[in-house]
Amino acid sequence: MFLLVALAMTNSRNKGLRFELQVAHLIDDELGIKLYRDLEQTRSADHGDLISSDPSWPFVIECKRYAKGYLPKDDWWQQVCTASKLVRKIPILVYKFDRLPIRVRVPISFVQLLKGEHDWRYYTDMDFPTFCYLAREQLA
């Protein structure tokens, strides 16, 4: 029984790692920005999965990859919002379920490009190409 649980956890961890690397590669392809896995995420809470060596990078990115489902869990969004508030950056949740395309959740203020305080109770989900379009506009 323990071996089965350990194998499932290892496979799950590997699946998450592969997805993080896939997202980093896609962002590099689309935006020309190199992202790296934040190794602090494994040691302490309230860290995103992907970071940039550029301190002006405005996002905290959390990646979630699951077999079943179609909508992200509320605690995934809370996790990335908590990490983002600590470093005053924009929360980005990139998620994928088996046989479905990659989706991205961002706060609505990101889409509207609002300035000032952020109310992260409001958000939008979009496909990955739409996220890259908006990210290019934000970075310009």
Give short role names for the model-derived ranges.
Residues M1-A140:
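Catalytic phosphate/metal-binding cores of nucleic-acid and nucleotide-processing enzymes, i.e., regions
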